[in-house]
C-alpha cells in the first residue's frame, strides 16, 4: 500500500512539474501559519524539508510533500505525505494528512476569518513540525520499530484570523488537536507577519483577503535582486490541553524565527526559516526549507 502511494505521488509530481502553466499564486509564505485559501482552479505543490537539532536524541531530517487545490475561490482541499531520517536509523514513513479550509466571509474585513480541518493518519515516528501543542517535547523516545507501528490518528481544527495592509500580512491561528485514539484535546497557536516581495512574477491580482499578490514590473529584475525577496517573522507554540490550558512556558514547546521567500521564476518560489527553540522542552534549532510550484486554471485552461 505504501509503495502504491509513493508511485501515485511521483506521477502527480511529474505531471505538475512537467506542465508549462503560468504562476498566478504564490506558496504560503509561512511554514506553520495558514491564512487565505488558494484561488479557484489553482494547484500548489510544495516540497518541505526540516533539519532539526534534537534536544534529547540524534539530530534528524524531516520531509513533507503537499498538494493543495482551490475548489472554489473560498474553499481549498489538499493532502500531505511525510517522513523522517534520524541519524543512525533508517528512513521512516510518517503518515498522511488530508486537509480542507474555507474562508467564511466573501469580502475583505478588518479581520478575515478562515476555518480549517485536517485528518492526520500518522504513526508514532512522525516528527514533522506542522504545529506544536499540549505539553512536553516531540523527539522520538521509544524504539523506532515500535513507534513506526503505533498509529496516531488526530483531527486538527484551526480558527484563523488575518489581515493585509498592501504587501504586509498579519496572521494568527488558534489550533485544537483532538486525538482519535486517545481522550482530550491539545491546544497550540501560531502567528506571523510577512512582507511580500515587490516582484513575484505573477499577473496583477489580489489574494482572497485583498492582498496585492504580486505585480509584475515592466522589466523583470535580475535573478539576484532584493525585489524578489520577501521577509517576516513567525512564531509557534503550545497552549496546554483540556486539563490545563494556557502558557506554562518551561513545559511547552515554543519556537520563533525569521522567514524569507525568494521568487525564482514565474513557476517557482523558495522559502527558508531558521527557527530557534525558546524553552527547555523545545529542540534548539529547526532549519526549515521549502520550494513551491503553482499552476492556475488547472482544469479550465484559458
List each model region and its residues.
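Transmembrane beta-barrel domains of Gram-negative outer membranes and organellar outer membranes
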Residues: 25-302
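Bacterial N-terminal signal peptides that target proteins for export
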Residues: 2-10
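Glycine-centered signal
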Residues: 2, 20-22
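Bacterial N-terminal signal peptides
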Residues: 11-20
Amino acid at each position: 500500500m505504501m509503495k502504491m502511494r509513493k508511485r501515485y505521488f511521483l506521477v502527480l509530481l511529474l505531471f505538475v512539474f512537467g506542465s508549462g502553466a503560468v504562476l498566478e499564486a504564490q506558496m504560503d509564505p509561512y511554514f506553520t501559519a495558514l491564512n487565505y485559501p488558494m484561488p479557484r482552479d489553482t494547484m500548489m505543490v510544495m516540497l518541505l524539508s526540516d533539519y532539526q537539532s534534537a534536544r534529547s536524541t540524534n539530530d534528524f531530517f524531516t520531509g513533507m510533500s503537499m498538494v493543495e487545490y482551490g475548489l472554489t475561490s473560498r474553499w481549498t482541499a489538499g493532502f500531505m505525505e511525510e517522513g523522517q531520517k534520524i541519524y543512525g536509523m533508517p528512513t521512516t514513513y510518517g503518515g498522511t494528512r488530508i486537509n480542507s479550509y474555507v474562508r467564511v466571509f466573501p469580502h475583505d474585513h478588518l479581520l478575515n476569518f478562515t476555518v480549517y480541518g485536517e485528518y492526520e493518519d500518522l504513526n508514532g515516528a512522525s516528527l514533522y513540525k506542522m504545529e506544536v501543542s499540549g505539553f512536553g517535547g516531540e523527539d522520538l523516545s521509544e524504539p523506532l520499530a515500535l513507534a513506526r507501528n503505533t498509529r496516531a490518528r488526530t483531527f486538527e481544527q484551526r480558527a484563523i484570523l488575518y489581515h493585509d495592509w498592501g504587501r504586509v500580512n498579519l496572521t494568527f491561528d488558534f489550533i485544537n488537536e483532538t486525538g482519535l485514539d486517545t481522550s482530550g484535546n491539545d491546544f497550540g497557536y501560531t502567528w506571523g507577519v510577512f512582507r511580500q516581495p515587490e516582484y513575484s512574477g505573477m499577473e496583477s491580482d489580489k489574494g482572497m483577503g485583498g492582498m496585492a499578490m504580486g505585480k509584475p514590473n515592466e522589466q523583470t529584475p535580475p535573478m539576484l535582486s532584493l525585489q524578489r525577496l520577501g521577509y517576516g517573522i513567525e512564531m509557534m507554540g503550545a497552549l496546554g490541553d483540556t486539563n490545563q490550558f494556557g502558557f506554562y512556558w518551561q513545559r511547552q514547546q515554543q519556537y520563533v524565527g525569521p522567514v524569507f521567500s525568494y521568487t525564482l521564476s514565474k513557476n517557482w518560489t523558495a522559502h527558508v526559516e531558521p527557527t530557534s527553540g525558546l524553552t527547555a522542552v523545545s529542540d534548539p534549532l529547526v532549519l526549515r526549507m521549502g520550494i513551491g510550484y503553482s499552476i492556475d486554471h488547472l482544469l479550465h485552461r484559458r
